[in-house]
């Protein structure tokens, strides 16, 4: 029997048993599709984690005010909201040599307006190292100058989403916009970072110098002198991160005069630990998805076997 004879015999058998052939093919297709989908979901989730790591940095610590160590977040009250200050930032900079960059920040939300265009966005009042810590670069215009950080100058650097909303295809450099009721001059625009690992639009933001935010944007909030809402830092070498975290915690407890056994009035968040936890969760989910895909293949195989047996 030639190859053509074999092919004709096979086609004749398929036509004669089209239902069995269709169901057999469907079982194979469902099993393979399940495997492909499950693998794709696992790889997509891992890609999101990698994106989060690149956006947040694996050599970074974030310090926020509030009582309590670790656990499920800060237990905030009006008296514990401003427990960090610029003195803490400078102490970390000078006393912990493993720290590469450190910056304090204030933050809030505001309405940003230019001509007939307006949008609700978030603002951050920052110190010089903040840009290096967060991977921000200036793509148009220039960054803040040294005097801007000390004189409460009304200069602003805008994110890509804000630039596009207010100015369309223009850069907006040199234009005056309003944050709330306060006029600011646009001196620069930031590189686009897209959606963050937690789903937020990282480009929907404007930056002003820390002292500018304190005097111009915080309003009647009644900040303690030199207070900041956040301190972020990076270390030069990732292997020093855990050691630096311990040093930072000890330094802040000393500066804040926290007695042994008392709770911290701050929280230190280790980004690498968060990423490790999320990665472990993703790996577990990938294993579960793989098990589901395997079950789908087995069920498909059993279905094929049953159809073949019935047709005999």
Regions found by a protein language model. Name each.
Residues 6, 10, 24, 48-49, ...:
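Hydrophobic alpha-helical segments typical of transmembrane helices
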Residues 232, 240-241, 248, 259-293:
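Peri-transmembrane interface segments
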Residues 42-122, 129-132, 147, 164-165, ...:
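Hydrophobic, regular-secondary-structure patches
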Residues 1-32:
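N-terminal Sec/SRP start-transfer signal
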Residues 13, 27, 34-42, 286-312:
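A hydrophobic alpha-helix feature that marks transmembrane segments and, especially
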Residues 124, 128-144, 148, 153-259:
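Mid-to-C-terminal secondary-structure elements
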Residues 29, 38, 230-234, 267:
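Short aromatic/hydrophobic contact patches that present stacked aromatics
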């Amino acid at each position: 029997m030639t190859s053509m004879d074999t092919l004709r015999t096979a086609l004749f058998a398929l036509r004669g048993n089209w239902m069995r052939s269709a169901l057999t093919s469907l079982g194979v297709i469902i099993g393979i599709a399940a495997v492909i989908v499950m693998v794709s979901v696992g790889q997509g989730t891992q890609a999101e984690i990698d994106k989060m790591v690149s956006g947040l940095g694996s050599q970074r610590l974030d310090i926020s005010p509030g009582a309590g160590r670790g656990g499920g977040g800060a237990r905030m009250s009006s008296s514990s909201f401003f427990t960090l200050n610029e003195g803490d930032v400078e102490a970390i900079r000078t006393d912990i040599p493993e720290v590469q960059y450190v910056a304090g920040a204030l933050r809030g939300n505001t309405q940003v307006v230019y001509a007939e265009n307006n949008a609700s966005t978030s603002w951050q009042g920052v110190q010089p190292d903040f840009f290096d810590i967060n991977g921000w670069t200036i793509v148009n215009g220039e960054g803040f100058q040294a005097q801007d950080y000390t004189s409460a100058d009304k200069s602003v650097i805008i994110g890509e989403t804000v630039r596009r909303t207010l100015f369309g295809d223009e850069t907006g450099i040199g234009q005056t916009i309003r944050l709330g009721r306060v006029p600011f001059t646009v001196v620069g625009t930031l590189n686009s970072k897209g959606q963050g690992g937690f789903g937020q639009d990282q480009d929907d933001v404007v930056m002003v110098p820390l002292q500018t935010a304190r005097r111009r944007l915080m309003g009647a909030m009644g900040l303690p002198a030199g207070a900041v809402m956040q301190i972020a830092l990076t270390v030069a070498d990732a292997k020093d991160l855990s050691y630096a975290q311990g040093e930072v915690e000890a330094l802040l407890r000393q500066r804040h005069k926290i007695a042994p056994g008392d709770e911290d009035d701050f929280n230190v968040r280790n980004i690498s630990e968060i990423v490790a936890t999320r990665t472990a969760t993703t790996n577990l989910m990938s294993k579960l998805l793989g098990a589901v895909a395997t079950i789908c293949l087995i069920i498909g195989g059993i279905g094929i076997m049953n159809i073949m047996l019935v047709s005999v």
